[in-house]
Amino acid sequence: MLFSDHPRTHYRNAPAHEVICQLRFPSILTINNVEPADFQEAIRAEFPQYARRQDAAPPRITGLGGPAPKVEQQPPVTNHNFVSEDNQWKLNLTKDFIALSTLHYSGWEEFARQLDKPLAAFIRLYKPAYFQRVGLRYVNVFSRARLGLEGTPWAELFTPAYTAPMQDAELPEDRFLNCACDLTVKLDSSCQAKIHAGPGMVKRRGPNVPQDPEVKFILDMDLSMTGNTPCTLAAGALETLHGHSTRLFEGAITDRLRDAMDAE
């Protein structure tokens, strides 16, 4: 089962590792060339820390199919980073997108509230024509140790849509060197989801940081709405994607896992 109509539930032991919202728009060159001082002032109370980096842009290839195709290097893209005082929230602004991310997701309502003000300020100051892509990504990482489920097979915690090979009782779980599932699913006329699911290791970032040896289950759901979304409908588009994400998440897990995550 890929989708479930199980009621939306808030879990005390929620597995969300990172949540990212990104809205792409037709390029606004001013963002790349002029410091976003007015935008910073509008959001500075919530995102007081600022940094800027130059991201390498992919090269452009011209003359494909001809006798002498050329690879043209593109100028770097300025990525403006605004970070909350507690370092829990990060806002990125480039000439092509605005994005909000957090490693401490507590629920959709708070996430939407954190996005409201910067998104409204961005629309007011930069007046994008529309949003070409509205994206919402949930990277969920399930730890059996954290949930008190050590020794419980993944096949008992996740539905066969994501664990079909591991449902074979004759083959021990540790025999699978790779058992990942990658799907692209159409959700409705304008929405789709790219899903990666399966056991894996989560690498900790930073120099000399000790790595966690526990094998975890990763459920990475990257949902998007394409087509030209009017700015006034961006919030509604995100609500639609969130609704789809709930059905996908609940469709991936079993009642055994729901119990361990401790529904409120």
What is each of the regions a protein language model found here?
Residues 1-93, 227, 233, 262-264:
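N-terminal low-complexity, intrinsically disordered segments
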Residues 15-22, 89-105, 131-139, 213-225:
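Glycine-rich, often proline-containing surface loops adjacent to acidic residues and nearby aromatics
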Residues 35, 39, 107-114, 118, ...:
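Short amphipathic alpha-helical segments
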Residues 46, 114, 118-125, 244, ...:
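Conserved short hydrophobic interaction patches
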Residues 62-65, 134-141, 255-264:
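Short, highly charged C-terminal tails/helix-capping segments
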Residues 84-126:
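Hydrophobic alpha-helical segments and helix pairs
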Residues 216-264:
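C-terminal structured interaction module
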